[in-house]
Each structure stands twice: as structure tokens, then as C-alpha cells.
Amino acid sequence: MKLTRRHFIKINSVAAAGIGLGVTPVFASAVAPVFESQRPKLADRKFTSKAVEAIIKKVKADIKDPEVAWLFENCYPNTLDTTVNYSEKDGKPDTFVITGDINAMWMRDSSAQVWPYLPLIKNDPGLKKLIQGVLSRQAKCVIIDPYANAFNEGPTGSEWDSDRTTMKPELHERKWEIDSLCYPVRLAYNYWKISGDSNFFDDNWQKAGKIILATFKEQQRKDGKGPYFFQRKTETQSDTAPNRGYGNPVKPVGLICSIFRPSDDATIYPFLIPSNYFAVASLNQMAEMYSAIGHDNATADACKALAAEVQAALEQYAVGHHPQFGKVIPFEVDGYGNQLFMDDSNVPSLLALPYLDSVKVDDPLYQSTRKFVLSDSNPYYFKGTAAEGIGGPHVGIGYIWPMAIIMRGITSTDKAEIVQCIKWLKATHAGTGFMHESFNKDDAKDFTRKWFAWANTLFGELILKVHEHYPDILQQTF
């Protein structure tokens, strides 16, 4: 069976849920629930960080609700416990990060999975080296193929070798998604800002950065369709691209095409707006690094110029009028005037724009857009007896993604809304102690992907943010 992010197994019993992680879920006793750690045994963990362990101990002690404390203990270290493969090659750190139940490294997921550990690297040299290894591996991946979204650990080939695109043995999958090039920039930039260490910005990373810049320009499609195309023999419409693999037509207006979304689903209109916002932030971050670290003002200026061009195009073409919510940001556009009003659970999303430093959380346009995407006017916003939240076409109608509930909490400044998000997350882990890819809006035991490290670590990030900014919230039972 081919294991991709589209592949999922619906688990309808809590007992089965822990099998893939080597753990046994704990059920409530007749007296009181007992929450035993669902982490692997110490000897079986992929990587152990003293700084992470100290944070777990500290934050757990400040969480009144024992089940939420248990979820935090299980989820926050899940990436380190189960998905990282650290080594040294040619005397340099190298870290391969799998998604969880898929044995491949997504550029997006690998960046997001280690992101919440960045604030700790100044106090943990081992953790710092591990993230250096991620940066190094990602630069190599970009050089191999900037259009690929997921990579193998080595040149082993893939079950997707038959896709009609330019596959290479190092690639797991070759779906062009703008954010696959933005996430590594975000990780590198913030690693530099937090640690003060610029050694990662070597010849290899600078080469990768220039490839990112060139790829973004190429996918503005000012000079034709460009070299990328993708077709797959499939029964799932969103798993392949129309028009012989080049996607639906666009008018070159300065925006960047993304043939696939961060969900790995094909775009309808290739100017994917959340990802274009993300690209602007990434280009400005690259400009700063090329200038301050590399003293390469020519590349820095080129990055700034492209960022300004995309930003101007967003302001002109990525504002729409919704009959109920007024002026909002559309999810996708084509430059001809067509706009798609929706949001998806995967990040980048419209909901997540402040999280990615693309807009201010109090920006009026973002706030009106937020109200839209968190309403039933968004075709992928689902309300059920288990919870309510954003899903998407990747899994299907009626399935809410914990990631979207988490992101709603992270981007909220409303304590009541944050409390509600934590309540939903507590109520929908189906007794497993972990976040999942998605769950049925009316039955949380009907879920997909029992081992999805990004969602787990992101839950940890939510709790850390609440602990820092709204500690009183954690002094209640949810």
C-alpha cells in the first residue's frame, strides 16, 4: 500500500490507536482517570534534550487539568522522541526528520516539527546541533530539486516514481508547493536570530537560497509555464494537476504559482494566497541574511524587489468582497478576476497568517477574513457533536483537523476562545494522548493518522504560548 499524506486508516477503537507508537492507551478507572506517559521508553527515544525535559517538567507543574498536562507531556516532545534521525556527515550535523507514520521528510513538516524547540537551543548544544542538521539537510534537498515537497533519506526511489514529472531517486514526492521553500527559510532565519550563529549560512545554503529565489521568479510565469509539470494516474481529482500537469491558467500579475496546497491537494486557481503571503515574509528574511551574513547585496536586493512585487500584487489581486463578511482575503485567485473563498486546515492558511509573520493579528482585513473562515460560510468549516473547526478536501467532508483548532488558539487574543480550543482538543484525542490528522466531527474515535508528529508538536507550542501569555488559563479544568 502506498503511504502518502492522502493515505489514512480510520481507527474505530481506542485500543488500536497506540499500536503504531508502541504504547497502550490508558482508560479511566472507576475511581479517577490515571494518565500514564505515552512516550517511548527512554532507551527507545530517537533524541533526548535536557532543555526540553526541563520545560515539560516546569509547564506540567503549572497545568491544573491532569489530562491536558498529560497531553502536553506526550505531544510536545513527540518529534524528538519518534521522528528524528541525527548523524554527522563529513564532520557536519545531518538530521532527517520523518512525518511520523510516513517514512519520508517533508520540507514543510520537518521545519514545523522542530520549530517549537528553537527557543531552547541557546541552553542545549545537542539540540542546537540537531537543528543545524535539519538546516543542512534542507539546503541539500533544495539543491537536489526545489520543486519537490518530500524526500527520501537516501537515493532509494519512491512508490511515486511513475508520476509524470521529473522524478529523481532522492525524491519521495514531487508536488510543487510554495511553502516547501518558505519553511526552511523561516527555520534558518529564526535559528540565526535566536542563536546568533550564522555558520549554517555556508556555500551550500547560499546556493539553495538563490535557487529558491530563482524558482519563485520562474513560477511567476511571466515567460511561459516554466519547467514544472505533474500528473498522476489516480482516482482522486485533487491528487493530480489539470492542463497536462501545468495547472489551471493564470494571468501573470506578479504572484507566484503553487500547483499544490500544503495539504498536497492540487490548487484550483494556482495563485495560492496564504503561500504568497508566506513567500513575501521569506524573501524579506532571505534579504536580511544575504545582506548581514553573506554581504551579498545583489542577492539581497533581488529578494527585496521580488518581495515588494508580490506584496503589491497581493494588495491588488488578493482582496475580495464577501456578501456577508465584506472585504476578505480569498484563498486562491488566478489574476483574471476569479477568486476562491475558503480556507484549509493546513498551514500556511488564511487563519495562520499572523503565525507566519505575514500580517498583524489586529489587521482589520485579517480579522474580517478570520470571521469568515471560522464560520459556516467557509465550505470546509464543520460543526458537530465532538467539536467544530476547519478541515479540508484532503480527508473529506465532515472531518476536522486538530491542527486548525490549535492554530485558532495560537492566533487568538480572546481568552474564552483559547479555552474553547483547549476543551475541544482535550475532548477529541480519542483516549490516545496524541493529536491526529483529522477526526469525524461527530465521533472523535473515527480519526486519521495515529502518528502525526507535526500536530503533536504544534499542540505543545499552543500550551507553551498560553503558559507564557495567559498562565491563568491553565489554572482551570477544561
Set out the residue ranges of the language-model regions.
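Well-ordered alpha-helical scaffold segments within catalytic/enzyme domains
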Residues: A51-K64, A112-P125, Y183-S198, Y277-D296, ...
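Extended ligand-binding clefts on enzyme/binding-domain cores
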Residues: M107, V142, Y147, G154, ...
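Active-site-adjacent bridging/hinge elements
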Residues: L80-P93, T156-R164, P249-R261, G431-E437
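C-terminal capping/lid segments that line or modulate ligand- or cofactor-binding pockets
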Residues: D163-P169, R174-E177, L340-K360, G398-F478
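Extended, well-ordered alpha-helical scaffold segments
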Residues: L71, P125-C141, D197-K217, M286-Y317, ...
